[in-house]
Amino acid sequence: MKKRNRVFQKIENDYAEFKEEMTQLSPEEVFEYAYKIYSITEIYYILTNAYNYTSADVKTVLNFKGNFLEQVYQEWIDI
């Protein structure tokens, strides 16, 4: 499998993991996490549809331990 395909697979897996976590929450908790859910969904769509990956980006994503989408979200809100 090409590295770029592995990047997309990792992002797909991370998004599926995030969705699974969110579906386990109560309706009230989902409401509280609405902005995070929206933001991570948008990040997911950008990274899978509109982002042009450099070799360094590919390496960063593939070497990242943990949920890459949540990390991007966290870094974005910390700005």
Where are these regions (language model features)?
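Acidic interaction surfaces
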Residues: 1-79
